[in-house]
Amino acid sequence: MIEILKDKRGSSPIFTAIIVLVFSLIISTVMYIAYVEIQTTVIRNAMKTGLANLAYTISEDTYTALRESDFEEYVAKLTGESAYRTKLENTYKGDIANSIDTSTSEYTVDSIRLSFTRDGMKIRYTCTCDVTFYVRLFGINMPATAKSVQVEGSHTAKYG
């Protein structure tokens, strides 16, 4: 192989072209993986921002619920299916949509979900979404990879 590369007569243009092509593909793959990681970080940061806004709303509502002595009812409303929970989910989805584009030609953010759990006087919330990345091949956007992004938060309801 080294003899072919040292050949001065020009008899190795196909071999050289293949090597250049392989290196180009490797560089393209590395750049695409870096792009996916960067975009995933951007989406995760947008989710964290939305989560901070959501945490403020939940904290404020928890304080009100504790003052009115119906914390158990509030937790049941938060962890079960209710209009209040739907309102929180829609607010969260709106915060994410205001921070980033949820659908572009490079990726789509789907299935934004919120789940709430109670651990003593602590309310935990988990936000999850699925991100599908696309590659344009021959004029058609093809799904290349899918990632699940998850962000968690909590606050302790100690206002006593």
In which residue ranges do the predicted regions lie?
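Short, conserved structural patches
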Residues: 41, 60-160
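Alpha-helical assembly-interface signal, strongest on the long, hydrophobic N-terminal helix that forms
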Residues: 2-83
